[in-house]
Every structure is written in C-alpha cells, then in structure tokens.
C-alpha cells in the first residue's frame, strides 16, 4: 500500500480560459479593405505552484492581423490548466510543466482564439501545432545566454549587465 503513494502522478484537475481580449481599433473601415492581412503570432508559456503537488500551467497566444499599417485585429488569449503532479523527480518537473502541460492546454486555446476571431467578423485564423519541446529548449538556451551575458556580476542602474 505504501508503494502506491510513491507512484508518479500526473493528473489534469481543470482546464480553463484565464484571459481573452479582442481589439479592433480600425473597424468598421477595416472591413472595406480588399488586401489580405499579414498575421503575426507570439507565444508564451508559464507555470507556477499553487499548493503542494498542484501547479498551474499557462499558454498565452497573441495574434495580430495588419492590413498595410493598420491593425485589423489583435487577439490575446491565455489558457490555463491546473495539474496535480506528485512523485516526479525534480529534473523532470520543469520539462513536464514546460512541455507536457502546454501540450494538454494548447488545443483549447487554439479553438478559443479561432472562435474569437470568427465572431469578430474576420475569416478564421488556424494556428498551427507548436512543438513545445523545441520551444522549451529555445527558452533554456536564451536563459543560459542571458546568464552568460550577466556573468560579470555588475549590474548597471538601468538593470543591464556591465560590459568589459
């Protein structure tokens, strides 16, 4: 019976839409434009502990559509999930929160973003799949580079690292 309490546990407690905003600063005139918009997508992932063995993981997507120099729409959504994670080795916890949890909640966010764009009167934007493992590795590399850049230990008044 004691062995059961030490079994690794990864369980979804809840998936929810934490934040969703839509801006159409140039409507209704933007609907008269014939040109196809350019689409920019930004992604961010976060996680935080809520209680012992309970974590919140978030994926934030910002979609900006522009026609010429005018913003057609800007949609930002943050999908979150609460996960119970127990008896996972420490070296596996960060990748689980940065890769596994986002893989679970991202499909919900994709659907919510597409729905908001369609309801705003625009053609749907279908967000592609995201390889969160590659995204996680890129974040680790950026963090390592940032730490290497700040290795002098001297921080300037503006928060930047001193350069030699």
UniProtKB/Swiss-Prot annotation:
Keywords, ordered alphabetically: Chaperone, Cytoplasm, Protein transport, Translocation, Transport
Segment forming the signal sequence: none
A biological-process GO annotation: protein transport
Any one GO MF annotation of this record: unfolded protein binding
Annotated PANTHER family: PROTEIN-EXPORT PROTEIN SECB (PTHR36918:SF1), PTHR36918
SUBUNIT field: Homotetramer, a dimer of dimers. One homotetramer interacts with 1 SecA dimer.
Function: One of the proteins required for the normal export of preproteins out of the cell cytoplasm. It is a molecular chaperone that binds to a subset of precursor proteins, maintaining them in a translocation-competent state. It also specifically binds to its receptor SecA.
Protein name listed in UniProt: Protein-export protein SecB
Gene name in the database record: secB
